[in-house]
A protein has these predicted regions:
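Active-site-adjacent helix/loop patches that line small-molecule binding or acyl-intermediate pockets
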Residues: 211, 226-230, 285-373, 377-381, ...
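Active-site SXXK
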Residues: 239, 258-281, 293, 460
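Active-site-proximal beta-strand/loop segments in catalytic clefts of secreted hydrolases
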Residues: 234-237, 245-247, 274, 294-297, ...
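Second-shell loop/turn segments in exported
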Residues: 42-50, 121-131, 165-174, 202-207, ...
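Sec-exported extracytoplasmic/periplasmic mature domains
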Residues: 62-66, 104, 142-146, 184, ...
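Surface-exposed, secretory/extracytoplasmic low-complexity segments enriched in Ser/Thr/Asn/Gly/Pro
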Residues: 1-246, 251-254
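Extracytoplasmic/secreted proteins, especially bacterial periplasmic and envelope-associated proteins
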Residues: 56, 60, 136-140, 178, ...
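Structured C-terminal helix/loop/strand segments within mature extracytoplasmic catalytic/sensor domains
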Residues: 223, 364-367, 373-495
Length: 495
């Protein structure tokens, strides 16, 4: 019985051995065929290529990187950027060679053993090797996107019939440098290929200064003022200017400018001439005289200051000489203020020799809107950087601190009318106003100052004249309204 079963057992064992050999042989053949493919778990440039051959892997990489566009979002707009637009190129040969090298480094029988036991090898990742043209990408972003989708800001526009401007609108501009970095990152990823383009808000510029000039003349027209308005404005940031003489829809030349009675505004040149001659801080009496002359508009303090600091006999002429040296040829003071003061000289200027227009200016004191405005500019420039015309013409005779003291005195002239009435409460205004009545009749009114605002500082000098009579209320309101329009020009609302 035992002798009959033993051969059967041997045959069964032999069969099992042969079967095992056959299975192993089949697995070996199968594994050998897989040897031409990349191992399971391998990635090239984040693209899974495990079990794929070289050609199929290359196709997968091309589909992921070279065929699939990058989706660019410009606000609500969607733009598809093909990698070729940036000359993006995969170095397939280098990446596949690196993958081949990694595969060949694994021992055959170790791999076969892992294959038999279905063990997954440690994942292998081959990094991306690619290049693109930064200049081509920049050109694409500039020409195809920025030029097409950027929105320029819209400047504020005058609101006809008012002193206001319609708010300007911000624009948008593509940040190209930052966009290049973001698109570069997206081009190098097979899955994160959406880019929200970085946009910068661009603030609208101020309207052209010509728009302000038109508005100021419209204000005169709407007020139905039938006299003459002389105005000088200087943007202290840009140097842009407005200078006009305007009456009943007609523009008069400002070369030379129009001569007006300067009245108390001539006290600004007096103060400048006094400070030119002060070698140190003024004593208490000089300080009192300057303050009463500027802040209280005292005439006697003006005379006493000239006699004390400038010259007891020729003070007015010395003030005039200083102004002419500064190039202000239409500004003069021909005598002191006290009643009956002698006329020390008869001045003829390009402004008062005009025959086309005549404001009947006082023979004792005259200026023009541009002359006094430019003098205010000179003082301002001296305070800012210790430079400007004052220091150029009179070197070592003015200091930055002295110029600031002059501004401080003018800033304490708190009238609350004219230029000051046109700006918000608390706005610093360094100014001097002036008018004269003859037998109870006022013909000329003026105000000149520096206005300090969040949107920029400026000089504004306004003179108005009427041959018959200026009525205070409409005349002062006209100056205030032009001042308000100017403030609004420099301080725009943006939406």
């Amino acid at each position: 019985m035992r002798s009959n079963s033993f051969p059967a057992l041997r045959w069964v064992s032999l069969f099992l051995i042969l079967a095992a050999v056959a299975v192993i042989t089949l697995q070996l053949v199968s594994f050998s065929r897989l040897g031409t493919n990349f191992p399971a778990g391998m990635e090239i440039a984040e693209v899974p290529v495990g079990g794929l051959d070289r050609a199929t892997s290359a196709q997968r990489l091309l589909e992921a990187y070279s065929t699939t566009p990058v989706e660019l979002h410009y606000g609500e707009e969607i733009i598809l950027l093909t990698p070729a637009s940036a000359e993006f190129e995969l170095d397939l040969e280098a990446m596949l060679a690196a993958a081949d090298q990694n595969r060949s480094q694994q021992p055959f029988w170790t791999g076969f053993w892992n294959y038999l036991w279905r063990r997954t090898a440690a994942p292998v990742s081959i990094p991306l090797i690619a290049s693109f043209s930064e200049s081509r990408l920049e050109a694409y972003l500039e020409n195809e996107i920025a030029q097409r989708y950027d929105q320029p800001p819209i400047p504020p526009l005058p609101a006809v019939g008012t002193v206001n401007f319609h708010p300007g609108t911000q624009g948008t501009a593509l940040n190209i440098n930052r966009s290049v970095d973001l698109v570069d990152t997206a081009l190098r990823s097979p899955s994160r290929r959406v880019v929200d383009l970085p946009l910068a808000k661009t603030n609208p510029p101020k309207p052209s200064i010509g728009n302000l000039e038109i508005m100021l003349k419209q204000i005169v027209d709407l007020a139905e003022f039938d006299g003459l308005v002389g105005l000088y404005l200087a943007d202290l940031q840009t140097g842009e200017e407005i200078n006009f003489a305007y009456s009943q829809g007609e523009d008069f030349s400002t070369n030379p400018d129009v001569a007006f009675t300067s009245a108390s505004i001539i006290k600004i040149p007096i103060m400048v001439s006094a400070y030119r001659r002060l070698d140190e801080d003024p004593d208490s009496e000089t300080t009192r005289l300057i303050e009463e002359m500027i802040v209280k508009s005292g005439n006697d303090p003006a005379d006493w200051l000239m006699e004390r600091v400038i010259d007891p006999f020729t003070g007015p002429l010395d003030v005039t000489a200083d102004m002419q040296t500064l190039g202000l040829e239409n500004t003069f003071l021909a005598g002191e203020f006290y009643p009956g003061a002698p006329l020390l000289a008869a001045f003829q200027t390009p402004a008062n020799l005009r025959t086309d227009i005549n404001t009947d200016p006082d023979i004792y004191n005259q200026t023009t809107p541009s002359d006094i405005g430019m003098l205010m500019e000179d003082i301002y420039q001296c305070t800012q950087r210790g430079e400007g015309n004052l220091l150029a013409v009179f070197p070592d005779e003015f200091t930055q601190a002295e110029c600031q003291s002059m501004i401080n005195y003018l800033g304490n002239n708190d009238l609350g009318l004219l230029i000051e009435a046109g700006v918000p409460d608390g706005t610093p205004v360094a100014h001097k106003h002036g008018w004269v009545t003859y037998f109870g009749v006022m013909n000329t009114l003026g105000d000149a100052g520096i206005v300090y605002t969040p949107g920029g500082n400026y000089v504004l000098s306004i003179f108005i004249n009427h041959q018959d009579q200026l009525i205070w209320e409409p005349a002062s309101e006209l100056v205030a309204t032009m001042s308000e329009a100017t403030y609004n020009y420099f301080n725009q609302v943006t939406r």
